[in-house]
Amino acid sequence: MSRLTIDMTDQQHQSLKALAALQGKTIKQYALERLFPGDADADQAWQELKTMLGNRINDGLAGKVSTKSVGEILDEELSGDRA
């Protein structure tokens, strides 16, 4: 992997750091997304997946679980029944 070094003022560095922090990202993540915006869709999908899985995990820990078996859920999904 290659490394890129950019000389900037302390003010520019602080601004870049703040912009990245506002989006919950590292400076590296923020800069790469700005340089290569085509990867943003994949990054957004990854963030959505992490959020969805986090919600599911929290629901499970709170006792909100299904009493159905995996087979029953699969059969429902394949038949289109969404009861």
From Swiss-Prot:
Record's keyword annotation contains Membrane: no
Keywords: DNA-binding, Plasmid, Plasmid partition, Repressor, Toxin-antitoxin system, Transcription, Transcription regulation
Note: Plasmid IncP-alpha RK2 is maintained at 5-8 copies per chromosome.
The protein's name in its UniProt record: Antitoxin ParD
Domain of life: Bacteria
Any GO BP: protein heterotetramerization
A Pfam family the protein falls into: ParD
Source species: Escherichia coli
GO molecular function per UniProt: protein homodimerization activity; sequence-specific DNA binding; toxin sequestering activity
Role according to the record: Antitoxin component of a type II toxin-antitoxin (TA) system involved in plasmid partition. Inhibits the anti-DNA gyrase activity of toxin ParE; reverses and restores gyrase catalytic activity in vitro. The parDE operon alone is capable of stabilizing an RK2-derived minireplicon under defined growth conditions in several different Gram-negative bacteria. It does so by the post-segregational killing (PSK) of plasmid-free cells, also referred to as a plasmid addiction system. Binds its own promoter, autorepressing it; gentically only ParD is required for full autorepression.
Transmembrane segments: none
The keyword Repressor is annotated on this UniProt entry: yes
Subunit structure: Forms a homodimer in solution, interacts with ParD, possibly as a ParD(2)-ParE(2) heterotetramer, which neutralizes the toxic activity of ParE. Both the homodimer and heterotetramer bind DNA, although genetically only ParD is required for full operon repression. Another study has shown that it is a ParD homotetramer that binds the promoter.
